[in-house]
């Protein structure tokens, strides 16, 4: 009714997927989630989190807000490089049952 975006706190997203057996799509955009703060830190990564925009209507505005707030890191590529290994061979799901 008010067209507010629905945000999902994904700090333990991998744990929830592993525990329930549902697909990431079922848990997020198919359930109406517009944005997820995808956390990998609590599942074995070092300081690696990402904002995933599932609804393109919010993409451009969010990018501008992030820049205005100063949330751009000059060496972010080193932090985000962890995600390549994290998603390879479903490592993120294999680690999830052992996360906090």
Positions of PLM-derived features:
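Conserved PLP-enzyme active-site core in the AAT-like
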Residues: 1-100
